[in-house]
Amino acid sequence: MKRIASVILWSLMFCTLWAQNVSDHFYAVILSGGRSRLMNHERYWNDCAFLYRTLRHDCHLPQQHIILLMSDGDDPAPDMLRSGAMGFASSPTDLDGDGLPDLHLAATRQNLMQTMTQLCNVLSTSDHLFIYVVDHADTNETGEACLWLWNNEQLQPDELAAMLSPLQVSSTAIVLGHCHAGAFVPWLQGEGRIVVTACAADELSWACPDRPYDEFVYHWTCAIAQHDEEGNPVFSDQNVDGYISMREAFDYACVHDRRPETPGITAQPQRLAERWSFSGLTDVIEKMTVSTALPTAYDLQGRRLYSHKQGLYIEGGQLKLKKR
C-alpha cells in the first residue's frame, strides 16, 4: 500500500509540475475599454472577471502572465454604469475575490501599446498569446469599424494589427466579443493565429437575457472552464480527450447562443483551432493536466468562504456571490 501511495504521490507531483511548465508558456491580455462611465456596463466587468478566474484557477496561468486593461484601471472614481441605469460605481480591482487587487491598468491606447511592446520583448517562439476583447465597437462615418477604449479613445483594426505584428510567438488566439467583431478579422487573421468573433461585421453583439454577462463570450468562457459562473459543470469536451480546444469552445458557445448574432472562427492553419488549448497544442503535448485540489477563493475581507467555481459578479453596483 505504501508503494502504491508513493507512486500516486509522485504521479500527482509530476502532473502538477507539467501543468506549471505548460502554463509558463501562455500569456493573456484582457481588454475592456468601456468608452465612458455612461457606456461601461456592469456586465463587461463580469465577463472579464469570469474569464480571469478561469485562466487563473482552471487553466493555471500564472497571475503575472495575465494583463488586465479595463476602463479606468485602478482609479477609484466611478467608471461603471450600474444595471438598470441606477447610478455609477467604481469597478472593483479584485476580480477573483481573494482580497488583493488584480486590475491596475486603464484601457487606454498608450497602455495597450506599452503592453504589446513589453510582450514583444518578453515572448519568444515557444510562447502562446491569448487576447480577449469585450465592450464597445462601432462604425465611423466611412463605415469602418473602430474599437472604443477608455475616455472615448478609438482604436482602428489596422492599429491593433500593427501592435501585434512585431510579436514572435508560436501562436496567437484572439476572442472578440464586441459589436462588429467580424470587421476585425481581415486585419487580424494570419499564419499561426485564431480569431473568434461574437458576431459578423455588420451585426451587434448582445447581452445575456437572463444574467449580467455578454451572451457569446459567457458561453465561451463556460466552455473553457467546463462550468458556469455558479460552478455547475458543462460538457464542452466533445472528443473527451481532457482538453478544451478553441474549436470546442466555439462550438459550445454557438450551440448555446440565444441571441441574433452570427459568431465566427478563422484559423491558419485550419487545424490550429482543433489543436489550440490552454493545456498546450494537443497533438504535441500528449499528457493531460491533472489537478486534484481546487483553489479556494476568498471574500473581500480575506476569509476562505467559497470555491472559485462559485460566481462572483456585479449587479446594481454591488459584488455578489451566487451559491450553488
Which role does the model predict for each range below?
Residues 7-16:
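Bacterial N-terminal signal peptides
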Residues 16-127, 279:
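Boundary/activation segment at the start of structured domains
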Residues 34-38, 72-76, 135-141, 153-154, ...:
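Solvent-exposed loop/turn segments at secondary-structure junctions
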Residues 172-266:
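Active-site-proximal C-terminal subdomain of hydrolase catalytic domains
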Residues 312-324:
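C-terminal tail/sorting-segment detector
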Residues 33-42, 97-106, 145-151, 206-210, ...:
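Second-shell loop/turn segments in exported
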Residues 281-301:
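Residue-level detector of functionally pivotal "anchor" positions at catalytic/ligand-binding pockets or at interdomain
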Residues 86, 90-107, 122-124, 134-167:
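A short, glycine/acidic-enriched catalytic loop
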